[in-house]
């Protein structure tokens, strides 16, 4: 079984670890679908890392490279990057697409993840 990284840090998720780290999580999980070639994806990376530190005891903030993990990307219909999906108890409960300011990302964590 895959091991989670330390609380408060970004978790890397793959097609192989998605079920264990996202769907089976007892905490809400925000998954950032991103790609190396995507400038807006890189623009939100620092904010996501900071929010992982801020909310890490209550939620998991994860990153999934869409190019390297096409199964999860297809399964959830991700067509644009970055896409953030919020999961609770294995179900998608919220989403946002595109680069957003840190205040918007924080709002997603507090409202859609119900923190």
Task: Outline where the language-model segments fall.
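Proteins that catalyze or organize thiol-disulfide redox chemistry
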Residues: 1-30, 35-60, 67-71, 75-83, ...
